[in-house]
């Protein structure tokens, strides 16, 4: 028995990477989705065992297609359609850790500046413009 054919945009929607098929289509067309290390078209028929690279915001995921589905199900069932590679998980964790540590090193004020402090800040920022 032959497996059913599923389009790339429909599979991404069914696997819950994108909320709508039109968003999935837009991401594929803009080059944020690569199928087996090549830019893909929306109507590409996906195969079990293929590798996908997805860019979502600051994150880049590498996933392997394990199963096919053209119906959107709950999140636990959708996660059974793919498996993220170990290197991808590790890379995303390192980036998240670096982003977290970077934000911790920046000083954050305890409170908002009052009126006098705001004026002083504005003077300081614009002091070269008036000289």
Swiss-Prot record:
Residue ranges of every copy of the S4 RNA-binding domain listed in the record: 6-67
A single BP term in Gene Ontology? cellular response to heat
User: Where are the stretches annotated Disordered?
Assistant: 98-131
Question: Where does the record locate the signal sequence feature?
Answer: none
Which SUPFAM superfamilies does this chain map to?
Answer: Alpha-L RNA-binding motif
Q: Which Pfam families does this UniProt record tie to the protein?
A: S4 (PF01479)
Q: Where is the composition biased (Basic and acidic residues)?
A: 108-131
Keyword annotations: DNA-binding, RNA-binding
Which superkingdom does the taxonomy of this entry point to? Bacteria
Question: Mind listing the GO molecular function terms for this protein?
Answer: DNA binding; ribosomal large subunit binding; single-stranded RNA binding
Q: Does the keyword DNA-binding apply?
A: yes
Q: Which family does it belong to?
A: Belongs to the HSP15 family.
Function summary:
Involved in the recycling of free 50S ribosomal subunits that still carry a nascent chain. Binds RNA more specifically than DNA. Binds with very high affinity to the free 50S ribosomal subunit. Does not bind it when it is part of the 70S ribosome.
Task: Please identify the protein, giving its name as recorded.
Answer: Heat shock protein 15 homolog
**Gene from which the chain derives:** hslR
